[in-house]
Amino acid sequence: FIVRLTFLLKYLRLFMLIKIFQLSNSKKKIEKAARKLVSENKRRYRKDGFDLDLTYVTNNVIAMSFPSSGSRSFYRNPIREVVKFLDLKHPGHYKIYNLCSERSYNHSYFHNSVERFPIDDHNVPTLIDMMRFVDSVFEWMEKDPNNIIVVHCMGGKGRTGTMICIWLIASDHFKTAKESLEYFGKRRTDTASSSKFQGVETPSQSRYVEYFALVKNKYHWALPQSQTLRIKSITIYSIQGVGKGNGKDLKIVLIMKKKIIYTCFCSSLKSCQGRSVKRLEEGSQQIVNKVLLFSRLRKHQIYYFPPLRLYLHRNELDNPHKQKTWNIYHEDFAVELLFN
């Protein structure tokens, strides 16, 4: 009986070990599939036993998604794996730039070689923060020729691409925003997996890369003089597909330095004046309507790039630029701001 029981226990132990191995193997496969699903066709690092949402944009610039712990590491880069990778490949020579305003981690994971430049998701950095960022990178790179930077936001695409692109311009890899943006997109996109573009797509982010190129190439690293401007009017063109189509159900909120400085409810025209304009285009049956708002907004300081007019077409506006919204935002949809 004892011999049979011993044999049974050994068999049961072997069975349990096999099951644990199978479950562990299955978990790894599920994690791998989940990370692939979330990262889509972003170029991943799959060498030396690593599988990370991480791309060498240049030999000393890395873009990656957020280094996560806990349940988020199931579908994002596990922070311990990122540490293992960087300590193996670039020991003592890497610096992390965390662009997430919404999330952080213990900097001691990366030997406290971390600097934060918080940017809200789908938003842009200020020009001042752009200048601070490139100054910080220059200082780090000049300390040792082996030094590298690792830049991340949450997905390692929009905010990450914005800041890496301005660094590529600052370090003379490229002269224009267009060249820099195209290059980052090509490096971050794994075309063998899918043709979906994984570069900077948000219009405002691309526009701010252009602003940075302007500061470097035209203003020779000096921000243009800050000027106090008053918003004279805001005009929204071709509004017939938005809400009621006459602008009366719109609400306009202006935010500066993450603070709401002005709100206008178009239904009551509180804090502003407005009118709806309909115009029949010559040689066309299309009615083009627009809403014109006259603001009593107090003056605020901004960095001024002439002229005193900002006109943004549908393709230059965040969200209306997406094809899936074009049943709402028609082809001639645009926003115009006049200043004085």
Where are the language model's segments positioned?
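Broad hydrophobic/π-residue packing in well-ordered secondary structure
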Residues: 16, 56, 112-114, 132, ...
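A phosphate-binding catalytic loop at a beta-strand-loop-alpha-helix junction
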Residues: 146-166
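Alpha-helical interaction elements in eukaryotic regulators
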Residues: 4, 14-17, 75-82, 126-129, ...
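Cysteine-based protein phosphatase catalytic domain of the PTP/DSP
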Residues: 29-149, 171-182, 191-195, 233, ...
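Structured alpha-helical bundle/scaffold domains in large eukaryotic membrane-trafficking regulators
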Residues: 23-26, 145, 196, 217, ...
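Cysteine-dependent PTP/DSP-like catalytic domain, specifically the C-terminal lobe
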Residues: 137-140, 161-220
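Scaffold helices S1-S3 of the voltage-sensor/voltage-sensor-like domain
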Residues: 1-28, 89
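Solvent-exposed, flexible loop/coil segments flanking beta-strands in beta-rich domains
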Residues: 206-230, 235-241
